[in-house]
């Protein structure tokens, strides 16, 4: 949040949008899946601060990894965080992950490092598939869409991308300078 003052200045003149991923409701699992980023709880604090400052936010709900973070409780927890934080939209390309050749082998190997034996389950169920959807994909997508619809959160990717491309001017134009004291 060290750039909050700059984001606020931008948002006064046009539209600043803060985007981030949320993959898991649980900080412990977050540290395993995303070891080099801040935890989910910290990201939620950022989203809430952005809401306080009236800076719109977009969450990327991806990747959803079968048998790891595809539990209904996880999805509902993330969505509740998003509702409370007042996010503008949630981008989701389906309840799964895509694995290109080369990435797949690396991913399956990495699975066994953290979740011993899980790669065998993936190989048996998905093999060389490019799209790896959760077995609960349809149910999870229904929960996702209904929660977003009821909360007034954008969830259709075309609508979100159109929103992201629209930059209305809110005040007179002026170029921000490194030397401004404002």
Give the predicted meaning of each segment.
Residues 1-125, 129-132:
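Conserved AdoMet/S-adenosylmethionine-binding subsite of the radical SAM
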Residues 108-182:
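C-terminal accessory extensions appended to soluble enzyme cores
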